[in-house]
Each structure stands twice: as C-alpha cells, then as structure tokens.
Amino acid sequence: MISSSLVRTRLAAILLTAVATNARANPAAIVPSGGEAGTAGAFSVDYEYELDSARITRERAGDPTADPLAPPPKHDDLQFSQFRHTLTPRLDVGVYHDTWATIALPIIITQARELRLASGVDRNASPTLQDGYLPQTGYDAQDPTTPLSGDLVFRGQDRKGIPEIRFGLGFAPMNQRRDDTKPTWKLGADFHLAVGRVMRFDRMAPDAETGVSDGVHKLTLWTTMDRKLGFYEPWIKLAWTVPLAARSTSLFQDPGFGATNVMPGQIAAAQFGVELYAVDDKVEHNSLSIELSGRVKAHFEGRGYSEMWEVFAYAGDARVAGNPLVLDADPTNAGIQAQSHPGISNIENYLEVGGSVAIRAQLGPRVHIAATVDVFKITDHVISFADSGIDLPTCGTAGAGTNCETDANDVVNPGTKEINPAAAPAIDRVGARYHSEQNLGLVLGVTGQVLF
C-alpha cells in the first residue's frame, strides 16, 4: 500500500517540473458557494507558454502563367512565428448559494514575433518587399538602424503588460455535489475590461510602443455541463464573445463614411472532454486523472491584429512621404487627407480546431494541480479583407432616408461618402490580398489551485 504522503510527494514532483504544459482546470467541476467552508471560493494561478506559426501568401493579379478563369493566384511570401508567456491569477468567491463572482488578471510576461522569408522565396521575389511595405534590408524594431540578415525580414518589439481585467458572475442551477442524481450545470457571464497600454506600432520610436491590449471591452456568455460517473467525468462548455465598446485610445475606431465591420469579430466556441480517474480516494481526497478534450472555435469576420499588422502600420505611416499604405481620411474632399494606417485589418471568418491532454491531481481536500498540452490548427483565411465601401440607396426611393446618393446605380462611387476610409486598395482589393495559411499553435503550461 502506497501512503498518501508519498502519493502527494510524487505527484507534486512530476507536475511541478512539467513546465512545458498548459494547465487549465476542468471548467465544470467546481462550484463556489457563499458561506460554505471548503467550497466558499478558489484561488488559482495559471502559467501558459504559447507558440504560433503561419505561412503568409499574397494574391498576385496579372500573373501571365495563371488561368484567367481561376481564382487569383497566390504566391508564397513570408513565414510568421510568435511566442508568448502568460501568467493569470484568478479568484472565485462564493457570494450566495451556488453563486460566485470571479476576477482574473492575465499578465503577458513577454510576447515576441517575427517574419522570415518563406521557403524558396528570396528578397527579390517577396511580394511584400517588392511593393515596398518593408525595405530590402528588412526592419528590426529592436535595433532599427541595423539591417537584418539571412531570411529574417521583420522583428517586432518585445511586448508585455496587462491586456484586460476579467470580471465574472456564475450560477449553478444544478450541482451534483448536492444531488448526485443530477449533473452540475453552470451559467455565467464574464466582462473583459480592456486596460493597460494599447498595442500600437511606431516605426520612428518602436521601443515606445510595447502595449498588449486591443482596447476593446468585451462580454462572454458561457454555460457548462459536467457529470461524474464513477471513474469517468464527461463535460462540455459553450461560450459566445461579443465586443461591446472601444476605448478612445484603441485602434478600433469608426472612420465613418462607407466603413463596415470596424470592431473585432464575434467568437463562438464549443469545448468538450472527459476526465478519466486512475486514482480516486474519497477518504483522503486524493485523485490522479488524465483528461482528453477537444474544441471548435468560430471567429467571425471583423477587424483585428493579423500576422502582418505591424508591417501594414510600417508601410502606412503618414509621416513618411510616398508610403504605399497611407489612408485617405475624407474621401469626399479633393486630394488625399493623409492618415496613417493603424495596422489592424479586416479578417475573414475562420475556424480554430484544437485538442488537449491534461494530467490532473487533487492533493487533499483543498489543493488541485494540473499540466496540459494543447495543440490547435486554424483554417486558411484572408487577413486583408476590407470592403471598398457601401452602395447607398438612391435618394427619393422607398426607405432611402437621408443617408442616400443621387446616382441610381449599384456601384461604390469614388470621391463620395460611400467610400470606406479604412480600406487600403493596395492590400484589400481582390488580386492583392494577404492570406494566412498553415496555421499551427501549441500551448504548454501548469496550474495550481487552492480551495477555501
């Protein structure tokens, strides 16, 4: 017979040394409840290390070797990579019977990204370098005066900070701990309060912009269902996130005129899994389990920070004469009212599909620790996707109202309020758009949780 103290010692040694894992507690298992010792609340700390990569391709209209009846041909351009370390302390406190409040503070310790030439592409063949969005010598935000060598063409500034504070409220209409004939069913809402410095890029002073927040407040509604059946514990989680409002310093501003989809896209997610117990000692409150889970997350069309956002901002700086991505702030006035491209762009719908394997342990009635490996893939999608504008109804027709045009046509007229000032035709029109392909991600980390 192995003593409970030895079990605890070995589990702690295994899990605390597994720094290359991503630990997230089963989202449906614990229900904080006001005034009840042992379940009054929980404090947890989650550490994550995330790696992301993608192939960047570019549409090239006019390719003489392409089929004129086929979609615009795409050419390999760049290879994107990014890593991020995140530490998230979280506090759940019971405020009433099976009702609790939550506060979480994600802290990005460091985030770094870079772009290299794709395999088989040299500096003379890269569409991005050919069009002058980056210089032939590349751009190093950490050392702007030194040319980049090899296949490296862009290195961003290391970023860090607090992107948001999450406030939540949850309620469990059913709790298996109280009635073992029923599952545990939870409902909740989380408010994401955007704080901290907004993520911007300044080619003149790159070290002055190290923020990580998008500056957009969001709301997430979620529900989970969990049922422990002997040594098995299946669960499911559904969630929906919608942007609410942007801070005045955020890049997500409505320029008016014919602009559409100026906020980040909504997100719908489904996560499901099963926890399998190898040890489940109800007397000593020790357990050891492995969990298998999967998820599907739908990202709907909207503006966002793509893999190329810093390059777009670099090439759209209105302070640099002749920059190719400078925007026109007022399309109704003659000439160009130069406005810097913010870097964010309209991004096509895409799916994120992932799966994870976790090792979880309970050490006595209060302590939970876990380690998880999470792998995900993102479907190919367009990352420069802004419409040229909107065709307004003809004035005087039924339902036209005051926001109308005098011409009776079905086109977006240049030089009118139909034009979208946020669109950069050089990257947003069909035949010039950027695509993000072969997206892969890996998240590794550990979690510790204490109940009180």
Specify the residue positions occupied by each region the protein language model found.
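Outer-membrane beta-barrel biogenesis signature
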Residues: T21-P68, R177-T184, H435
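Short loop/turn motifs that connect adjacent beta-strands in outer-membrane beta-barrel proteins
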Residues: N26-G41, D98, E114, M174-L187, ...
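Residues on the lipid-exposed face of transmembrane beta-strands in outer-membrane beta-barrel proteins
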Residues: Y47, L87-V95, I103, F167-P173, ...
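Surface-exposed strand-loop-strand hairpins of Gram-negative outer-membrane beta-barrel proteins
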Residues: Y49-T86, R116, D202, A208-E209
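Gram-negative outer-membrane beta-barrel proteins
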Residues: L51-E59, I109-L115, N175-R177, L193-F201, ...
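Outer membrane beta-barrel transmembrane domains
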Residues: T65-D67, A125, D143, R247-F452
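Residues that define the transmembrane beta-barrel architecture of outer-membrane proteins
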Residues: S81-L87, R159-I165, P183, G215-L219, ...
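Outer-membrane pore/translocation modules
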Residues: T110-M263, T397-A408, E418-A432, S436
